[in-house]
Amino acid sequence: MKGYAGTGKTSLVAAIVNTLLQFEQQVVLLAPTGRAAKVFSGYSHQPAFTIHKKIYRQKNAREGVGIFNLGFNGNANTLFFVDEASMISMGSQDSNFGTGSLLDDLIEFVYNGRNNRLVLIGDTAQLPPIGVDVSPALEADFLQVSYGMEIYEANLTDIMRQSEQSGILYNATRVREMIGAGSFAKLLLRVAGFPDIVRVSGGELLEELDQCYSSFGMDETMVICRSNKRANRFNEGIRARILYREDAFSSGDKVMIVKNNYFWGAEYDKVDFIANGDIATVEKVGKYKDLYGFHFVNTRLSIYGYEEEITAWVMLDTLTTEQPALSYEDYRRLYMAVEEDYMDVASKQKRFKKIQENEYYNALQIKFAYAVTCHKAQGGQWDAVFIDPGWQGEDSHDDEYWRWLYTAFTRARKKLYLINFKDEMIEMEG
């Protein structure tokens, strides 16, 4: 089921799910990320889980810690609904899960159960997974050819919500229509006459952000950027000039996990692993340690959607790097430095095991989460969203840019702020 913003996809899915439950039909609700599952649960009024949590099971310690196999599907005669399916990829840099292809594993898991059906829900105008041009889970022809499945497809196109009253929806629709037409001529965004969309200059930004933190709360306010470099600058400015944080890392800070971690969840009953994209609040900052050429701090974290607080070593170096997480070169450097501690272990296999169990080697990789890239924001929604367009050269407005902008626009529920958007992109009043 494909549908653009405002076409009633959310309302329709909620109605279908709840009608099925009234007929005592088994349903399972899934989404690619924890935040997307939270949004899905919120509008359907039913529990929703991440795909990973539902379909994978960790191997025992003897087989390999942090390795997840496809689990047993005990559901029969069940409809599996998967929201935000545009985010589901074919391949992964993280091969710790199943075959390494989330789409392959999801389909295999669902149909391993007797008489199950799968409903994939998403918006084809959003950003596809990194590294591909389209979202494979929303391509009916691809699914039919690749998996030999019979596909029934519905595409919601008519705007059902009143876009005349919503600047967010009105402009998102205009951007999406440009994507659909394959035309990337100059698009003018309409701000005048809409109370929910506001242009903000650099000089007004901090005051507006501070006001949103007061009105909507920090957890319901997000800045979305084009790059990690820009997000770092915003995070630095917000911490220093709004939150008045003098230390490089403080209690109360909002952070995002930027790499899956299988080490620190092991001692907690309800935590299989800590996921890339999870947002956490720093509850307590413990001792600092400089080791192996990197900086670590022992930290207690309250992670969004988790029942228990987690105590772990976190790596501070990733807070300011312009890469999404620790680079391959730095990871290699850390590995070799840790290995030096175990050179007295003659067996390479035993030495490797020691490194894999080293708590600093397994430190959580984090970034501040007051501002994030659009890929990191995908699947989530916030009451107030600030969009930083970054560099706005003429040749930068290609298909990827408009998908980026559409995805960023549709993260906002109540208020959208356009930071330093050029006059040439804004429709003149009157």
Predicted regions and their residues:
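C-terminal accessory regions
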Residues: 291-430
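Short, solvent-exposed amphipathic alpha-helical segments in soluble enzyme
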Residues: 45, 238-242, 403-406
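ASCE P-loop NTPase helicase motor core
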Residues: 2-184
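Short, conserved phosphate/pyrophosphate- and ester-handling motifs at nucleotide-, phospho-/glycolipid
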Residues: 33, 227, 379
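Structural beta-sheet core signal
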Residues: 29, 119-120, 223, 387, ...
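Conserved helicase motor core of P-loop NTPases
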Residues: 110-116, 124-283, 287-326
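Short beta-alpha junctions and helix-cap segments that line functional grooves
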Residues: 32, 266-269, 400-405
